[in-house]
Amino acid sequence: GKENIKMVGPLATLNANYIKECLKDDYELPIEGLCKHEFVFNGLKDKSTGVTTMDVAKRLLDYGYHAPTIYFPLLFHEAMMIEPTENESKETIDGFIQVMHKIAEEAKTNPEIVKGAPHNTPIKRVDDVLAAKDPHVSDCSINCCL
């Protein structure tokens, strides 16, 4: 209702800052301070593993989370924009944080599992360049809008 709509902005801001503070030890935070409803990490802090933002995004799929916007803004080489919604429960947000910590740990102990993700999806990692140059939308098993 009318009273609850006033909480949309503050809740989105609270959620974003909570996630940022919880993950800043594992992920590089290029801009310090309070954020609004979104913030950007610049990949993992430990760059020695060779695990990229794309790898982290694909690994999130294995854990049932939609990958965030990646490689935007172009200001940062390994940008990962985290933009939690205002209506996520604390349990859901804590689950996301736990998975992000786990992926950071996997990157240190078994980087190949992160680099090879996703493992649990029907379609594995897509060759983005080939898909852009030679799309085969007719191969899709879902015949919507074709």
Label each region the model flagged:
Residues 2-146:
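Non-catalytic terminal extensions of PLP-dependent enzymes
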